[in-house]
Amino acid sequence: MNIDTLIIAVAGLFAVASSIGVLLTKDNFYAALYMSVTMLFVAAIYAAFNIQPVVVIIALIFVGAVGIVTVAIAATYRAGVSRKVNIFWVVPVIVVFAILALAYASMAVESIEVVNPEVFSAVATDYFFVVAFLFTLVVLMMLSAIKLARRVDL
């Protein structure tokens, strides 16, 4: 397993873990935050394959616009949990997850090849200011959403 495969696999695992966090959390605010983190990891997977337009679209639209609107709405609307999760759903979910994991493990026979192997060093140099700007923009928008929701001064 080469470093490219490892980076993509780790980003995929974190994306799956944070998407499970969206399903398991009972608070809309944290579900929106988990959704934004999930989309950032999906964008990281596309960045590993050197597909920059998709990364920019995911970062700007999904994380930026949709994530901030969802965070703002979820932070202002705090309702009680209307549904309970039945414990009997745990076993079928684990069985389906095990079947999917086994199918994926049996079909993954080769390493993932990246078209441009210098992509990871290029992201650090060529797109540093773009990534820093997008990260700063997302943090500022989330802070303003929290400020509006809680009506406090930061």
Swiss-Prot record:
Membrane topology category: Multi-pass membrane protein
Entry keyword Transmembrane helix: yes
GO cellular component terms attached to this protein's record: plasma membrane
Ranges in a coiled coil: none
Subcellular location(s) per record: Cell membrane
Keywords assigned by UniProt, alphabetized: Cell membrane, Membrane, Transmembrane, Transmembrane helix
TM spans (from-to): 5-24, 29-48, 53-75, 87-109, 124-146
Name assigned to this protein: Uncharacterized protein AF_1823
Species this chain originates from: Archaeoglobus fulgidus (strain ATCC 49558 / DSM 4304 / JCM 9628 / NBRC 100126 / VC-16)
